[in-house]
Structures are given as C-alpha cells and as structure tokens.
Amino acid sequence: MVEIANYNCPTQLVIAGDAAAVEKAGELALQAGAKRVVPLKVSGPFHTSLMAPAGEALAEKFRSVAFGEMSFPVLFNCKGGPMEAGETIPELLVRQVQSSVYLEDTIRAMAGMGVDTIVEIGPGKALSAFVKKTEKGIKTYAVETVEDIEKLCEALKGEQA
C-alpha cells in the first residue's frame, strides 16, 4: 500500500506506505519519467491511513482536553487551508496524523490571506524552498542559530523602515 503523504510544492510529492511498495513505486516513478526519487529515512508511514491507530490514540487523549475558540485563522496542512465553522481542532489534528499534507495548498492559502513573509524555524531550509517554488512573492527566512535570529531581526527592522 502506497499513498501520497505530502504535496510539498509543484515539483515535489512524498509517498509513504509499506516499505517494499514504496520502493517499487519509486522504481515505477523513475520509469514513468520522474526526475529523481529520494528515499527518506523516516521511522514510519506518516501522513497515511496506516497511521490511523496513532490518530485514534490521539483522539482518545483529546477527549480530556478543552479547546477554546480561535482568535485568529489557523491553517491545517491536512486540508490546505484554515479551519472552518463546524470543524474542531481535535478532529483536524487527528486528520493531520493520518492523511496527506497539502503544503502547497497551505502556502497558496497563506498568500491569498495576504501573508508576505514566512519564518522557518528549525534545522534545514526545505520549507523555505517549497514556499519559493510555490509563491515567489513571499519572502522566506530560515532560522537555525542565534546568529540567524539576529540576521532575521535586522532584516525585519529594515523592512519596517
């Protein structure tokens, strides 16, 4: 079983599922004209229906947690956009564990909401690269170190001047 786990940007998908099936799907993708296939070193079939047991465990934990109303839009990658009336935070977080990540749609939704700057915090610059491939008008900053934070602060001060 193989599913698309991530729709990262116009030029990149991530598949996940049973290891042998994912390997075979990668071979078939190359035969069909994919430019490259990069096996990811991950510990599970994240963002697929194979994660349903984890989603159920998460749902059980959420039964004892009170969630309030959101005071600003919150976007969920499992739907590629903001939470809507009738949807609940626990429901969407459970979905996020066991369904595809629609990052490209989420980036486009942010652009549609007027977002013009995104700060990526953590190791690597992959998310910033996906933003640049999806919405060229959005500025990105990748922050990994204290020095990066200082550079970000200076850059943002310069934009406000």
Regions found by a protein language model. Name each.
Residues M1-K136, T140-A142, E147-E150, E154-E159:
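Acyltransferase
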